Amino acid sequence: MIPKSTCFIVEVVYECEIWPINVIENSFISLDLGLNNFVTAIDNQSKQPFIINGRAIKSINQFYNKLKANYQSKAKISNNKHFTKRLAKLSLMREFKISNFMHKASDLIIKCCIKHKIASVII
């Protein structure tokens, strides 16, 4: 268990069988990281590029900043504090959402690499 400011996180570790993957030598995928387009990727096997939209992260951060400013102003007026439990919970929820987005994006890239038997990833 990992204690956080407002909750506990339980991490489960388990072993699984790793299957060998046949890859094509000299095959690669190139990733271009950005803001509006979080990842733009193209490989030399399918030559079909794909884009992972990054506007979701911008939206999460914009909403977080809006609520944070509101809660900070209320906390400063009412009890002259800069950080409260509500702000801690808000920060934790933002962290969870961004972590979930990153996990889904990396999973999509890995599935593409397995599907097209990619040997190298270039960032």
Where are each of the predicted segments found?
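Metal-dependent phosphodiester-processing active-site neighborhood
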Residues: 1-123
